[in-house]
Amino acid sequence: MRGGQGAARAPVIQFTNCRILRGGALLREDLWVRGGRILDPEKLFFEERRVADEQRDCGGCILAPGFIDVQINGGFGVDFSQASEDVGSGVALVARRILSHGVTSFCPTLVTSPLEVYHKVLPQIPVKSGGPHGAGVLGVHLEGPFISREKRGAHPEAHLRSFEADAFQDVLATYGGLDNVRIVTLAPELGHSQEVIRALTALGICVSLGHSVADLGTAEEAVQSGATFITHLFNAMLPFHHRDPGIVGLLTSDRLPAGRHIFYGMIADGIHTNPAALRIAHRAHPKGLVLVTDAVPALGLGNGRHTLGQQEVEVDGLTAYVAGTNTLSGSIAPMDTCVRHFLQATGCSVESALEAASLHPAQLLGLEKRKGTLDFGADADFVVLDDSLHVRATYISGELVWQVEEARP
């Protein structure tokens, strides 16, 4: 029903009594939807001479583009890095459960794993449109194994790899193919990394720099080769130093290709990044900040021991550690919690907080005409929020896919 006459015959839904996020501002306007897309009401009125078939009162709520999570390792007991005969059912469970947190699209993320895990899991996670069944899958994020041993974090050292002489063929042999892959995180200081970055970006795959001890010069060279993202800024990289700020220095570098800027992921869970560091990053480069959850399989579960790939993770309160260590191992905060914490910690505008979880990840992936926006013609993926940014409802392609249960009298 999205194209041609089919879309034109679809019912027109008018969402009223709302504030919609468009063009960086919250506007008191109605949102018009038909055939799964955002509709221009002027064309409806003056060219088609039609009105809405249905009106829905939003009770003064905010309508924002659906959240996009480009780094999520699992959740609700599901570990994307665990090979099984039915990986798809686990992905589907997470896709369904994250709807309640306003996420309409995501990149299932695999941490460093044995080769057989990549070969078994990757073919089972195809790109998939969202709907009542769950959030859409935009492609897999492969975080490792081509990362620094020194900054491996929760990644198992035994399965880390360096690039062989025929580097891109080594990548293909490691992953077993790249058909379902959208993002690859690697350490740019590894030998042959620049040729790998060029080869991946030529295929339309986003290259992210992370788990790395790279200096600024090496990071800048990686961006010149095509890298566009930084994996969880500040975490698992050299700390900022005034004589060589390392990867962090990319936020204000003057050696990036003309017309391009770097995007960077931030885990705003109140654990991974001090509020002062959040403020420094946001004030230095607000348009590049991408909120990510980096959620682990323990998301939505209680205290105790859980898995993350080949490692055991221990959850204590709001923090997840590699079992028996003090090394952080992902987050257990969902995306809407990260948005609220980011807003509170940085003092930024509501609009900026919402765009960090929607527009910016869409721009990173080159999807800003379809996702992360409520502009005319975009996919009608949006989240309904109250003034405190708690999710009231989630829509995908204009269809209600999740709604909060109202308190009973």
Swiss-Prot record:
Q: Which GO terms describe its molecular function?
A: metal ion binding; N-acetylglucosamine-6-phosphate deacetylase activity
Where does the chain bind a divalent metal cation? 143, 211, 232
Q: What InterPro entries would the database entry show?
A: Amidohydro-rel (IPR006680), GlcNAc_6-P_deAcase (IPR003764), Metal-dep_hydrolase_composite (IPR011059), Metal_Hydrolase (IPR032466)
Q: Kind of enzyme, top EC level?
A: hydrolase
- Recite the UniProt cofactor note for this protein: Binds 1 divalent metal cation per subunit.
As recorded in UniProt, its EC number(s) are: 3.5.1.25
Swiss-Prot/TrEMBL keywords: Carbohydrate metabolism, Hydrolase, Metal-binding
What's its catalytic activity? N-acetyl-D-glucosamine 6-phosphate + H2O = D-glucosamine 6-phosphate + acetate
User: Quick one: which pathway?
Assistant: Amino-sugar metabolism; N-acetylneuraminate degradation
Residue ranges that the Swiss-Prot or TrEMBL entry lists as coiled coil? none
Q: Name one GO biological process term.
A: N-acetylglucosamine catabolic process
Q: Which cofactor does it need?
A: a divalent metal cation
Give me the residues that bind substrate, please.
Answer: 154-155, 235-236, 243, 269-272, 328-330
Which residue positions are annotated as catalytic? 294
Family that this chain belongs to: Belongs to the metallo-dependent hydrolases superfamily. NagA family.
Entries under PANTHER family matching the protein: N-ACETYLGLUCOSAMINE-6-PHOSPHATE DEACETYLASE
Q: What does this protein do?
A: Hydrolyzes the N-glycolyl group from N-glycolylglucosamine 6-phosphate (GlcNGc-6-P) in the N-glycolylneuraminic acid (Neu5Gc) degradation pathway.
What protein is this chain from? N-acetylglucosamine-6-phosphate deacetylase
